[in-house]
């Protein structure tokens, strides 16, 4: 895989490779697409996805992003009960254009700032709106 390559995910979306170090999200995106295709109503993924997570939240907290507020809140409460530090993070729609590509459906990274959030927005592209999804970035 090289910068400029175009890959196709299992759900048919095309992805322009900008950064070859952002390969984990490609694999996770396919897993999410397959979980949706299999009809799962709730999907929680856990990944050491971005170094930007540690920059945003430090070494002790993991970030939780979701397309469903109540499901994310339930996961955060469960983490608290287990003694884990989990912090709710947004999926800001105004950052989604950072993933736009002129040659594919989206790029595999969104730019130099907000890396944890754009990674979450990237993954959200592979989950249907009716699937309750929570992404935990535990880097």
Predicted regions and their residues:
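A generic structural signal for tightly packed, nonpolar segments enriched in small/aliphatic residues
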Residues: 1-139
């Amino acid at each position: 895989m090289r910068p400029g390559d175009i890959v196709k995910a299992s759900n048919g979306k095309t992805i322009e490779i900008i950064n070859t170090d952002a390969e984990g999200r490609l694999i996770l995106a396919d897993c999410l697409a397959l979980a949706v295709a299999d009809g799962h109503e709730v999907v929680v993924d856990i990944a050491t996805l971005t170094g930007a997570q540690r920059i945003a939240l430090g070494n002790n907290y993991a970030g939780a992003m979701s397309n469903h507020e109540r499901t994310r809140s339930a996961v955060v409460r469960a983490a608290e009960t287990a003694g884990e530090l989990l912090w709710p993070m947004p999926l800001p729609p105004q950052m989604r254009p950072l993933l736009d590509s002129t040659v594919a459906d989206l790029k595999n990274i969104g730019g130099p700032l907000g890396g944890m959030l754009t990674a979450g927005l990237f993954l959200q592209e592979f989950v249907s709106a009716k699937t309750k999804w929570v992404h935990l970035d535990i880097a």
